[in-house]
């Protein structure tokens, strides 16, 4: 499994997602609360998956996805009301609320 970065504006949300992934044997490389932190975390990595919420204090998930280096995918976890009907491009969307198994299998699929 590649590098996993968990990124949510609320630290508790990030911890919860991180704990689910770790509990299922998926190592998390970094936990971030802003888009800038995510981009800084990707500097030393060649590829990976960013598991993200919809909005940060400094940017949206779409802006973050546009700035991610090649080799990185973004998995958005948000209510479908946030993104349904929009063309999300290369962003993979997982509707919240979700089942733990859905999160784990989606991360492994990417």
Segments (PLM) and residue ranges:
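Conserved acidic carboxylate
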Residues: 7-8
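Two-component/phosphorelay signaling modules centered on CheY-like receiver
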Residues: 11-30
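Conserved phosphotransfer microenvironments
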Residues: 14, 35, 48-69, 80-82
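Acidic, metal-coordinating helix/loop segments flanking the phosphotransfer/catalytic sites
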Residues: 31-49
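Short loop/helix-cap segments at secondary-structure boundaries that form the rim of catalytic
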Residues: 41-42, 82-91
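A short, hydrophobic beta-strand element within the central beta-sheet of small alpha/beta folds
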Residues: 71-84, 94
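C-terminal output helix
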Residues: 98-108
């Amino acid at each position: 499994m590649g590098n996993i970065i968990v990124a949510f504006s609320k630290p508790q949300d990030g911890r919860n997602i991180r704990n689910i992934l770790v509990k299922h044997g998926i190592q998390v490389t970094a936990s971030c609360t802003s888009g800038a932190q995510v981009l800084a975390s990707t500097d030393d990595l060649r590829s990976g998956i960013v598991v993200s919420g919809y909005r940060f204090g400094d940017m949206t998930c779409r802006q973050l996805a546009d700035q991610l280096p090649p080799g990185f995918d973004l998995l958005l976890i948000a209510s479908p009301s946030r993104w349904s009907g929009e063309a999300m491009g290369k962003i993979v969307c997982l509707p919240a609320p979700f089942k733990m198994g859905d999160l784990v299998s989606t991360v492994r699929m990417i």
